[in-house]
C-alpha cells in the first residue's frame, strides 16, 4: 500500500438497521425446499459483519436454530460457501479456512501463505484464539505437523504474531538490507533463517526502509531477487510477505487475477479474498485490479461465475454501472 494512502472496503454498516426484521425476513426466505436466495443476498451482503452477528443472535432467539447450520442445510455448492462465509466473524473465518487447508490428505499451502502473510499481529492473535475454540486444536502445532523445512519455519514465525510495530531505524535498515542481499547470494540454511527473521519480525515502516536500501545495494527489487534465488513454497511465502508490505491491495488484486485466470476460476480463493477484505480494502483492491489488468474485477467475475453465486460475489464487490 502506498504510504499514507486511504483504503476502503465495499461493505459498510447498513443505516436504520433492524436485526429483528432481518431475522424475520431470513426466516421466511429459508422456509421450505425452495429458499429465496435473492433475499439472502440482499440482506447478508448489505450488512456489516457485526450486524450479521446481531442478526444471527436474533434468529437463534426467534427460531431456536443456529443460522449457519440452517444455511448449510438449505444451500449448496459455492453459493453456500459465500453465504456461510459471510456469517463467520473475521477471526473465525480465517480459522475456518486454515483448518480446511490442513485437514484431510494434502495441504493447501497457498491458503496458508495468503492468510498468514497478510494479517496483522492482532488479526493473527484473534485467529489463533478462534482456531482453538472452534477446533480444540493449536494452530501452531497443526502448521508444524502439516508443513516442513524453511517454509514451515517462516509460517511458524508469522503465526507467533511478534512483528514489531511503528518502529524504524535507518542505520539498522542498511544492515538488514545487506543481510537480505547476502541471503540471496549464498542461500545457505543460516541465510534463509536470517532472511525470514527480518521479513517476519521487523515493522512495516522499518521494512519499507530496508526494501529501499536493498534496491540501492543490489540494483534489484527484493521480489525479483527472491524469485531469482529461491523456489517452492518458501519462495512464494517470502514474496507474499514482501508484496503485502509494499502494497497489500495490489497483492490481493494479483491473487484474484491468478485465481480467476490461471486456475480456471479457483472458487475458494476468490470467495475467501472477497469476504475477508470486504470491510477492509476491497474497493482499493478493485481499483488496483483495473489499473494492473485492464479489466474490472466485476467484469471478470461475470465472465466466469453464474447464477446466484455470481450475484452474491458481485454484491460483495459492490460494482458500479460502468463495471459491466
From Swiss-Prot:
Which GO molecular function annotation, any one, does this entry have?
A: calcium-dependent phospholipid binding
Question: What would be one Gene Ontology cellular-component term for the protein?
Answer: mitochondrion
> Which parts of the chain are Annexin repeats?
17-88, 89-160, 171-243, 247-318
Arranged from A to Z, the UniProt key words for this protein are:
Annexin, Repeat
The similarity annotation says:
Belongs to the annexin family.
What protein is this chain from?
Annexin A10
Species for this entry: Mus musculus
